Each structure stands twice: as C-alpha cells, then as structure tokens.
Amino acid sequence: MYVCGPTVYDTAHIGNARSIVVYDVLFQLLKFCYGKATYVRNITDIDDKIINAANEKDSSIESISTYYTRAFHEDMRSINCVEPTHEPKAAENIKYIIELIEYLLQSGHAYESNKHIYFSIESYPEYGALSGKKIDELEHGSRVEVGENKKHPGDFVLWKPANDTDYKLSSYWNSPWGEGRPGWHIECSAMSYAYLGKDFDIHGGGIDLQFPHHENEIAQNKSAFAGSMFAKYWVHNGSLTVNKEKMSKSLFNIVKVRDLLDSGIKGEVIRYALFKTHYRKPLDWTESVISESQETLNKFYRLLRGIDVASIEKSDVEVSRDFIETLKNDLNIPEALAILHEMATKINKTNNENEKLKLTESFIKSARFIGLLESSYQEWFTAGISYQEIKRLIDLRKVAKQNKDYDAADKIRDQLKQMGVTISDNEDGTTTW
C-alpha cells in the first residue's frame, strides 16, 4: 500500500491527521487479514511551499523539512498512529525520479521544452479515467503549471530548471537536462516504483489529491511501464471542514494537531473525533465533536477500572469477530465504534464476573485494534494531574465533611469529577478514587 504523506513545510492540521488515521487502521486490518502488509508513506521534502518557507525564514530547505518531519512524527505518535513500513523522502530518491523521466522521454510520453521536461497528457489515451475528467474539457491552469511552451495546457512538469532561489537554497540536483528539481507528481510515482515496484495493491490519499495528483501518477507509471496496472485499488478519504467551512489561512480557521494537544485535548480524543464519519464522507470538525468524543472515551475508560491492562495482550480472548467483519466492509469505522458501544452496554449489564472480564478483555482488544484505549484507567483520568493534587483535594474534602461543611465537600467532589477523578466513600471512612 502506498499513501501520499505530508509536505513538510508546516505542522500537521486535522485534515492531514484524518488521512493518516484512516490508513493507519487500514494497515492494521491488512496485517490482521493477510499476516503481512507493506505500507509506504512518503515525505514530500521538495516543493515550492518548502522553498518559500525556507526563503521567508532565511533557512535551508533541509532545515525546514527536517524540523517539520520531526514535528509530524511527534503529532502522529500523539494520536496513536504507528509508523509505516517505509517512509521515503523525495530528496533521497532523485535517482529513481530521473530514471522514470528517462523512461517517459524514451517512450514518447514526455518532451523537453525551454529546459523543462513535460508529460504529454494527449499521449496517454486513458487520461482522466480515475477522476472522470476529459482532456478537451480541462480548464487552462487547473492546478497544473501553465506555460507558453506546452503542447497542451494540461501538460504537467516532470523536471524544471533551477532558478536563483534554488541556487540560493541549494534546492537543485544534477540531471541529464541540467541542474534543476522534480515536479511534485513524478516524486510519488518514482517512490512507489522504488519501494513497491511497477504494480501494487492499494494507493491511498485524500480526495483532494484525486485530480490532478493521482491522475498524473497513473499516467506517468502506466506510460513508463507498458502493461502495468500500477495500483489495483484506489482509496480516497473525504474532505474535512471546520464549522461547515473549508479550512483556509484567509478564514483563520486552520486547526493544528499541535494546538489541540497544547490546549489539553488528549491525542486519543482527536483520533476518536476523526472516526466520527465514514472515511469516504466529509467530516465537519466542531467543538461538539470533540466534547462528544471526550465523553465517550471517559465512559469507555471507566470500564477499565481495576483491570490490569498490561496483561490484556497475553489474554487468549480475541478481538470481536463482528468488529473485524465490520471493518472489512469498506473500513466502516463508525459502525465498528457502534459495536464498541454495544459491548460497553453488555459489560455494564453483566453480573457474572468471569463473563464480565472476558467481555472487557475483548472490548479492550477491539478498541486497541483501531488505536483506542491505549492507556489504563488510572493514566487516562489522571493525565496531567499530580497524585499529590488529588490527595490534597481528597484530604480537604475529608476535613470539610468532618466540619459538616457538606456544600464545600460537594464542590470538591465536583472539582475532582471535572478533573476526571471519580471518588467513592467507604464504610470505614476512607475514600478511594
């Protein structure tokens, strides 16, 4: 499986995160079903946006891309995403990029014009099959570079000559066509070829990449390698809006994963919120989505009280079969979450302790299959809260009760509850939490 990864010029926003968590779950499912799966997710570290960021900050593209790649990894770990099998960078695969361009030139699908190498979309009769676009209907300048030296306005650049900014930032490489750098589309084509070969099973990415990026990848790879299927299946996750508006700098509504984490929202809450709608459908990000996700996870974690979660992996209890079958049905994560809710209800209604334990173990394993319930009860409800602070408040409440100041005692109980700490008064006068 090949998935288009981030362009590392800034920290990840929730739109980026949605794509990552979708293919993270798909990767787990593929491994479960087939025993082994190879997941390649690239890092785009050669791009105009990175060059602009480096120029603005008087830095180098290597410094910018290294910094934001590290930030991306930290953010994705925070929302419980596993690392892919391979994570190639464009700058480390120039050899394969040049090789692929040479194949396209030799086969007549690419041409040189004014020191640029372009792909000729008219040379590939199936162009537009993925997106439903037709060559004669393509608008001039539709997310492809337009220039006077193209044979068709939809032709896109494979290699561009270095300019003054490229020389200043060392963002250029030697090639048979002179010093320059690759176009965006050829980078992914070359990296999927380098790590998965001419043909592989699944290609994923956001719906915004379907055209022109994925359409262009297909044209490049199938033109370079006669008879190639390239990717057998294409998977696209839906778009994400914020309060029903498209995320954009002009609207000042870009929601960064890092900002959410810094505001005290747990990574697992962010992950759950990104699962709220089917992966192919649009997702609208709102405050209520976050609060509902927090409440649901609090409810789930209360079922873990007294459970030794460290021993769960050793248990012979399996992930719910219904849960797995639901995920197999077009990765229906919202329906899988509904099954978790059903399991939680059964656990609460069951009086038989052995049955309750088995149900809880299956519940935890099922949730962990999609990256949820990775903490213990204690860790979840005391994250960011010190043991000393909890003890101090419990002691204050005890004093308030002794002084018959029950209003103060109730306020402290409510304060602890808001912190996620549930307390229970025992017959011997002690309090557990």
Curated annotation (Swiss-Prot):
Q: InterPro entries from the entry?
A: Cys-tRNA-ligase, Cys-tRNA-synt_Ia_DALR, Cys-tRNA/MSH_ligase, Rossmann-like_a/b/a_fold, tRNA-synt_1_cat_dom, tRNAsynth_Ia_anticodon-bd
Give the residues the record marks as binding ATP: 249
Protein EC: 6.1.1.16
Does the entry feature the keyword Nucleus, yes or no?
no
Q: Which gene encodes it?
A: cysS
Originating organism = Wolbachia sp. subsp. Brugia malayi (strain TRS)
Q: Give the keywords, sorted.
A: Aminoacyl-tRNA synthetase, ATP-binding, Cytoplasm, Ligase, Metal-binding, Nucleotide-binding, Protein biosynthesis, Zinc
Q: Name one GO molecular function term.
A: ATP binding
Q: Does the keyword Zinc-finger apply?
A: no
Q: How does it assemble?
A: Monomer.
* CC per GO annotation: cytosol
Q: What is this protein's name?
A: Cysteine--tRNA ligase
Alphabetical list of Gene3D superfamilies matching this protein: Cysteine-tRNA ligase, C-terminal anti-codon recognition domain, HUPs
